[in-house]
């Protein structure tokens, strides 16, 4: 039985595959998928929060708030923390700040293996420096965008870019999660390119974060690249992705609803949990919908300011700006309605 659920994004349709235990054929098919998925241990899997980065009024990283948030996310059930991605405003920070942010987060949690920092920059030398640092401090892996300034780049050009990074870093400990977010980067990562990269660097290219919001693309990734850890960038898509053999998520709304995502992770393959899964899925969709009421990054920080009772969370890195006071009040009022 397929239940169709419209997400807040008008162009995204989430298909939740629910179990109909009255049909033996469907039950056996689902059980086979569950067993295959549970046996498949990806190097990187689970719930990873695309962490927002708190800053002071002058744009300095607020390491106290960051440390508190990272510790809280791990306690709430996140398997890992993806620092300095799109949600973390990574490309608004210089190299020194990005190194400081990663080191502070690792030191406060004493869990370097939980971290998947974004290390991409427009300059390949800077990306190599950040990636080498991440490897040296014990990060589980790094999340790498394709080169995103020049548009219309060929697969050959993108391959040379990634190859240059990997060869330039020259460390067998390196593990790379490719980052497919074509609506922002304008540079899609094609299946043929993934094939070529995995063939050239089978022990290094271990995953892909797909933030396209397209379930069909996730399905095709799982079918074509079963050894690749396929991670969705959309919280509500984690459940159907797991049912297709995916590895988990790296998402923005996990800053706010990590516990609900963990309920889905822990229960999706169990019998008689449909009600529990639906309740958590509904909450995730509502939190994500609210986070996108205005600018998503500013709204998430506004929600975190309320949750932690810390106005320091409201500050944004230029060129992004905080929500207007009236918008903040509306968001906080709706938060109270969702979590009375």
Residues of each region from the PLM?
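Targeting/processing segments of secretory and organellar proteins
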Residues: 11-12
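Short, Lys/Arg-enriched N-terminal segments with co-localized hydrophobic residues
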Residues: 20-39
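C-terminal alpha-helical cap/extension of soluble enzyme domains
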Residues: 48-52, 76, 243-246, 253-340
